[in-house]
């Protein structure tokens, strides 16, 4: 997933109706693999914290389990990112090895009991706004299939993609209700903090895009699509939701 990037619906639009999937296939070509989108959790949560985040100063020295690009962004903001296996998160958070952790969202976080190890539950998940899961297929095996059987695989992956985000929407709201009953302190990151993280994210992504030609192609395609699709998201989904707050 790309920090401050596309939502699940925007990502699917880019993959299926932009050139996202073609570029994905191009990236995997030399590995003799065929990728297919096969799931998405939707926007995740920002994480569980044992310290309040009131300003960018609170990010300095923050020990947080957050891998990948999000971890690089946190490091540049003054924090210390940790990469921990899921089985290590609860104990590390409870004992103070880390101050905070991101995992997924209410449904998965409840299963891990993270509300018993941290005081504050922050949103939004700026680091994973629309993480696309993949089904990876051996290219030779895929090419040896008939067109009909290839279509069956493609359609099954697309069905799994749609099913997962629908499933998460259903299970997340139920888990959120549970957290509210448990009096979990659900808080929004301050705009100052999100603005700083967004600025750093842009720097990180731009640096990555300059590493090689293929990275530049993916970056340019992704960012151009995001630039064009976001205005519609803001006046459609966001416009509707904000119209009766």
Residue ranges and their predicted role:
Residues 1-11, 23-245:
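N-terminal secretory/targeting leader peptides
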Residues 15-23:
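Core domains of carbohydrate- and sulfate-ester-processing enzymes
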């Amino acid at each position: 997933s790309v920090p401050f990037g596309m939502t699940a619906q925007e990502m699917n639009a880019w993959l299926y109706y932009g050139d996202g999937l073609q570029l994905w296939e191009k990236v995997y070509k030399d590995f003799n693999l065929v990728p297919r989108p096969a799931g998405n959790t939707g926007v995740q949560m920002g994480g569980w914290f044992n310290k309040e985040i009131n300003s960018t100063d609170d990010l300095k020295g923050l020990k947080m389990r957050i891998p990948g690009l999000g971890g690089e962004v946190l490091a540049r903001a003054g924090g210390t990112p940790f990469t921990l296996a899921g089985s290590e998160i609860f104990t590390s958070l409870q004992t103070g090895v880390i101050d905070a952790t991101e995992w997924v969202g209410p449904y998965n976080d409840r299963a891990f009991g993270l509300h018993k190890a941290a005081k504050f539950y922050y949103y939004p998940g700026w680091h994973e706004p629309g993480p696309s899961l993949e089904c990876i297929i051996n290219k030779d095996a895929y090419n040896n299939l008939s067109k009909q059987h290839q279509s069956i695989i493609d359609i099954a992956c697309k069905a799994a993609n749609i099913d997962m985000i629908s499933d998460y929407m259903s299970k997340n709201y139920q888990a959120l209700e549970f957290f509210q009953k448990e009096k979990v302190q659900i808080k929004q990151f301050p705009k100052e903090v999100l603005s700083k993280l967004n600025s750093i994210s842009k720097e990180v992504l731009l640096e990555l895009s300059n590493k090689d030609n293929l990275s530049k192609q993916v970056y340019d395609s992704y960012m151009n699509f995001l630039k064009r699709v976001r205005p519609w998201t803001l006046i459609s989904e966001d416009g509707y939701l904000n119209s009766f707050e």
